[in-house]
Amino acid sequence: MQPTNERNFDMSTLEKPLHIDIPVKLAEVKIAFSVPALAFEGDLPACVFHLQLIENDIADWNAKAQVIAVFHTNAGHVTLNNNAYNTERNVATGNPYKVLVSDLMKRGVHFELCGATAKVHNWGNEDVLPGIKINTDAIARLTQLVQEGFVKISE
C-alpha cells in the first residue's frame, strides 16, 4: 500500500484481529427506538444504521423479534412521502430516507410517527409513507411499549 495524505476509512484493509469478549445471541428481541432527532454517521442517520445492525443480528440469531421505531419531535419528517417532505423541508428532491425506511420495513421494523408531532406540523395520514402508523403521541406510546416489556433505545 502506497503512503498517502488521504485518510482511508476502508476497514477491510485493516488486518487487526478482533476477539469478541462478550458475545451476544438472543432468542427474543423486543426493542422500541425513540428517535426525536437525527444524528449522523457520515450521511446515514445513526438510527437507521442501528436499526440495520440489530436487524442483521436478529437474522443471524434467527430470533423472534419485535422492533418498533417511533419518530417524533425533530425527526418526524423521515416518515413523510415525497410531496409532504418537499413542503416541510423546502426542497424538491423528495424524501431521501424513503428507500431506507422501506427496506427496514420489509425486514420487519415497524415505523410510527408521533401524533402530536404530526398535529404541530399539520401532517395528515395522506402525508406519510405507506406502512407508517401514527400513534397518539411518542411519550405515551413509548411508555406503553416499555410497560409491555420492550427495551427502549434512545437515539
Predicted regions and their residues:
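Secreted/extracellular ectodomain signature
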Residues: 1-155
